[in-house]
Amino acid sequence: MRLCLIPWNTGTPQRVLPPVVWSPPSRKKPVLSARNSRMFGYLSPVRIPRLRGKFNLQLPSLDEQVIPARLPKMEVRAEEPKEATEVKDQVQTQEQEDNKRGPCSNGEAASTSRPLETQGNLTSSWYNPRPLEGNVHLKSLTENNQTDKAQVHAVSFYSKGHGVASSHSPAGGILPFGKPDPLPTVLPAPVPGCSLWPEKAALKVLGKDHLPSSPGLLTVGEDMQPKDPAALGSSRSSPPRAAGHRSRKRKLSGPPLQLQPTPPLQLRWERDERPPPAKLPCLSPEALLVGQASQREGRLQQGNMRKNMRVLSRTSKFRRLRQLLRRRKKRQQVRSISACT
């Protein structure tokens, strides 16, 4: 180890040596730098390997024309509801039929509105807005599509005919269009063989709330009910499904069944106490004797079965012992015979 002298006191006078302190030298770590890097090793040049593979670069030719892609145009169409389309189709078909038939005269318009009226004072405003002779006018019912359809069917049915039957008509009970009935207070009874569905449709269209409170209409409602046997037969010829549905509706329309609440259990003992023991059914002495006899027979049968099983097991054991004894005797006889020879 190398020792270095370090002055202790620099402020001493001349001709006096300072005290000497011996201490080990400090170990400094070498620092790598550009100057002293050659001291630690030789520098070797970095070699880059050559490219051995070949690369073919494919560049696009200038002759080729670039065609930009066109985006397809999306057409969005709002679909109309089915109900609106059906209503439009029906309106168009009705207009075509009306155009084919031609314009109706005032008399025809009055005749088409005639099945809904009972006297000369009633007219319908939905088909003929101009009032005729009278004071009562029925309002148009265009709120629901069903009522409109029923009205159109009723009008088309009466427009196909040529007249309205009445009891006071001059020729054959038929009046020409445009002429009012002289005494239209009460309609005659229905002719046998004729269906009453247009009158029923008119009543359904008008409803109970829209019918005016007049005695004439009440008489019409009473006369419209079929009373003749022929009319009853025609009404019975309708499909039975409607009657079945009506009967079901009538049954369901009644008040709902109310279940009676079950009464609470009435305990004969208090909550803290236990219930009394169950009582056994009283049997007659004869029944008791019969039951005891059947029990004895069952026990005897079980005992006999056990005895039989024991006997069988014993017999099988005895048979096995006998077979063993016989085999031993045979072996002894064979040995004695072989010894004698």
From Swiss-Prot:
Top-level division of the source organism's lineage: Eukaryota
Biased composition, class Basic residues, residue ranges: 243-252
Sequence segments annotated as region (Disordered): 78-131, 216-282
Basic and acidic residues bias locations: 78-89
Transmembrane segments: none
InterPro entries documented for this protein: POM121-like_prot_1
Skewed-composition ranges (Polar residues): 108-127
Pfam families noted in UniProt: POM121
Coiled coil: none
Family designation: Belongs to the UPF0607 family.
The protein, known as: Putative UPF0607 protein ENSP00000381514
Species of provenance: Homo sapiens
